[in-house]
């Protein structure tokens, strides 16, 4: 189990780095990524700013079903500081339902900002960033044998994006990760984390999310990701956020460089569509949706009018029959008299 997890991680790192060195700032920063990783300059990149008045409601999007998240097994999970983020390897017994194919879990990782500065999440909703963001990475196991193979294919990956804000109380689920950060302070350090209920890392409301086609947010920026960004947020305490912002280093040796602001700048949406699994109060509709809604209302009113017409006609006919019956009975009584 441990060997296979380490092998998977090595393959993923090689695929992600491509033998090149990259950072978020400086001469190897994200402005220079396209020079070494051409796909980073393509037109379906992530993250994006999700504008809720421009999304398209899709009633066919079901609530996600995270299978096995509450029972991740008994084997310890590997936590690794790879110099870009802190990453937790996940067992393949975890998978997502509610997607076109079966996507099994591979790893999760975090993105965050730095103390005293706003922002830290990669995705934004209505131009509003949060302090951090959790990504849970899955790959299409129906079509591909490994994460590295799926990462290069359209919709080979399915990533859950959870925006994280600061709340008043400590989040016990996130503490299972954050309490071990001091064991992986420097790049390439690893430790083991006891298995825990991963479902509690997710928002309670899994039926409200946004869906779009995008990319990895780090080199090589493959445009292979079916993104699910939850509308509801998770919360951690300020103490937990500061631990995330101030514990890890992106370097192996002195002088140590604090691992902060490991989030990519927003990318243009271009011609892509963003779908929503729900209708927000006060949200606007597209022209097609408004036309469909208008036709639906018109047809509904017509059906109602027809129903009222036939009911009224039936009542009128019955009344006429009753009147004829009364007249006939009265005439018969007069004749007999």
Curated annotation (Swiss-Prot):
Residues 16-290 are extracellular. It is a single-pass type I membrane protein. The active site is at 84 (proton donor/acceptor). Its EC number is 4.2.1.1. Keywords: Disulfide bond, Glycoprotein, Lyase, Membrane, Metal-binding, Phosphoprotein, Signal, Transmembrane, Transmembrane helix, Zinc. Residues 20-278 form the Alpha-carbonic anhydrase domain. High expression in all parts of the central nervous system and lower expression in adult liver, heart, small intestine, colon, kidney, urinary bladder and skeletal muscle. Its main location: membrane. Zn(2+) binds at residues 109, 111, 135. GO terms for molecular function: carbonate dehydratase activity; zinc ion binding. The chain crosses the membrane at residues 291-311. The modification Phosphoserine is found at residue 325. It is found in: Membrane. SMART domains: Carb_anhydrase. Belongs to the alpha-carbonic anhydrase family. This is Carbonic anhydrase 14. It comes from Homo sapiens.
